[in-house]
Amino acid sequence: MNRIAIGLHYDGAAFSGWQSQPHRNTVQDYLEDSIERFAGVRLLTTVAGRTDAGVHALGQVIHLDTTLDRTTFSWVRGINAFLPPSIALQWARPVDESFHARFLAFERMYYYALYTGPHRVPLAHGRAGYLMLPPGQRLDVDAMQAASRCLLGEQDFSSFRAAECQAKSPVKTMYDVTLKADGNWVFLRFRASAFLHHMVRNLMGCLVAVGRGRYPPEWLAEVLAARDRKLAAPTFMPDGLYLADVKYPEAYKIPAADPSASLFHGVFRHDAA
């Protein structure tokens, strides 16, 4: 039995999230259907992180087990031939049977693209969150960055956890929150050991509230300490959220994600990640 690790990108706008569902309009269902057409047998996948409806991926990782002996390029080219244009394999590589896409991941990174201009941007529809602020208004990105400092380190993120979250513990370690402003655009990067269900979108709701001046930066620390979801801002829209990268022990030689074909090309290039 061979274990294969696979990296893929997808535009989540048209899908009901990653996880397989009866109506089958999910990334997992399209992927496993395409693998079956390529391999001639149904192969089940294990994923690094299940994304919600409307959430995208630049660096999703899966693994599968198979008796097929194919070159890595054959896996990529063959499966891509059956996938819709909004899903694409980027790489495939054989890995030791000890590799596990979910349980061996020690860091995950998410990006969020937020447009704050006074009108919609059709070419970014479904691929960015938006506020449509009046002309001349800007989010206070410095206040948002200041507020985010309380999130760093090992924290109990219960205040930013969805009610249906199945994680055993709300305690996670946040390594970095970075914001970059470029005209009407604000780009955010979140790096952590792992994330709770809706955690990034709930943090986005709070950071945007601070950026609009509805709360001072220190309010976010109060919400974090309270461990009460009712005190946080509403969950922000999924459109601008991207699973950007997943990191594994170096021994497995899992390729880093490539954001060059996305809204984030060059945004965080000179920052340590």
From Swiss-Prot:
Residues that coordinate or bind substrate = 110
What are the recorded GO MF terms, alphabetically? RNA binding; tRNA pseudouridine(38-40) synthase activity
Q: Which residues form the active site?
A: 52 (nucleophile)
> Which InterPro entries does the UniProt entry name for this protein?
PsdUridine_synth_cat_dom_sf, PsdUridine_synth_TruA, PsdUridine_synth_TruA_a/b_dom, PsdUridine_synth_TruA_C, TruA/RsuA/RluB/E/F_N
| Enzyme Commission number(s) | 5.4.99.12
Q: What Pfam families has UniProt attached to this entry?
A: PseudoU_synth_1 (PF01416)
SUPFAM superfamilies listed in its UniProt record? Pseudouridine synthase (SSF55120)
Q: Which UniProt keywords apply?
A: Isomerase, tRNA processing
Q: Which domain of life is it from?
A: Bacteria
Instruction: Extract one GO BP annotation from the record.
Output: tRNA pseudouridine synthesis
Write down the chemical reaction(s) this protein catalyses: uridine(38/39/40) in tRNA = pseudouridine(38/39/40) in tRNA
According to its UniProt entry, the function of this protein is described as: Formation of pseudouridine at positions 38, 39 and 40 in the anticodon stem and loop of transfer RNAs.
Q: How does it assemble?
A: Homodimer.
Give the family from UniProt: Belongs to the tRNA pseudouridine synthase TruA family.
Name assigned to this protein: tRNA pseudouridine synthase A
Which species is this UniProt entry from?
Answer: Cupriavidus pinatubonensis (strain JMP 134 / LMG 1197) (Cupriavidus necator (strain JMP 134))
